[in-house]
Amino acid sequence: MIGKLTGLVDSQGEDHVILDVQGVGYIVFCSSRTLRLLPKPGASTALLIEMQVREDAIRLFGFPSEVERDWFRLLQSVQGVGAKVALALQGLLSATELAQAIALQDKASLGRAPGVGPKLAARLITELKDKMPALGPVDSLTAKLTIAEAEGTAPVAAQDAITALVNLGYGRPQAAAAVATSLEALGETAPLADLIRRGLKELAR
């Protein structure tokens, strides 16, 4: 079994990178997010590997961290989610954003990934909501706000700020994270306009 590869980036395709390890080129499939993080051809990099052995092929999937690899495995535990859909979800949302979307029951954000319809988005939420703690804690500030928003106990200004950012085109997990950071800096009594203004600055970083 291959658990990690370290080598030179040879070239990139739409869904994979060819990694040159001591003269041997390995085709490693990655999410679009991971591919964007890789250095230019000729530079050295390392990827954690998930190897899937099938009757007709052996496929390697690469990840920049253990958390990303764990999410890849966890997503595929849901019926209807294969490697392609799992990578599509990871290309769209970071590990933290995935956890937030599931905690918020945000089917819309999950449904933006190719291959994920409303029914599969609902199944992801139902089957994974109790499994996320095994992957480590989500950012505590964001987690508290997303749970409070789902329960209707978050400050009204915070809820309105999240809605305003979503209406501007941002995903709900990203908006919730930005507002959570803004609340920490400005305080829970911060007015709506200040939360939106600070949230936009956070999202622009």
From Swiss-Prot:
Compartment annotation: Cytoplasm
CDD domains: UBA_RuvA_C
Protein name: Holliday junction branch migration complex subunit RuvA
Function of the molecule: The RuvA-RuvB-RuvC complex processes Holliday junction (HJ) DNA during genetic recombination and DNA repair, while the RuvA-RuvB complex plays an important role in the rescue of blocked DNA replication forks via replication fork reversal (RFR). RuvA specifically binds to HJ cruciform DNA, conferring on it an open structure. The RuvB hexamer acts as an ATP-dependent pump, pulling dsDNA into and through the RuvAB complex. HJ branch migration allows RuvC to scan DNA until it finds its consensus sequence, where it cleaves and resolves the cruciform DNA.
Keyword Transcription regulation: no
GO MF assignments: ATP binding; four-way junction DNA binding; four-way junction helicase activity
Family: Belongs to the RuvA family.
Signal peptide stretch: none
Entry note about domains: Has three domains with a flexible linker between the domains II and III and assumes an 'L' shape. Domain III is highly mobile and contacts RuvB.
Pfam families attached to this UniProt entry: HHH_5 (PF14520), RuvA_C (PF07499), RuvA_N (PF01330)
Positions of region (Flexible linker): 144-153
Region (Domain I) location: 1-64
One GO term (biological process): DNA recombination
GO cellular component: cytoplasm; Holliday junction helicase complex; Holliday junction resolvase complex
Stretch list, region Domain II: 65-143
NCBIfam families according to UniProt: ruvA
Subunit and partners: Homotetramer. Forms an RuvA(8)-RuvB(12)-Holliday junction (HJ) complex. HJ DNA is sandwiched between 2 RuvA tetramers; dsDNA enters through RuvA and exits via RuvB. An RuvB hexamer assembles on each DNA strand where it exits the tetramer. Each RuvB hexamer is contacted by two RuvA subunits (via domain III) on 2 adjacent RuvB subunits; this complex drives branch migration. In the full resolvosome a probable DNA-RuvA(4)-RuvB(12)-RuvC(2) complex forms which resolves the HJ.
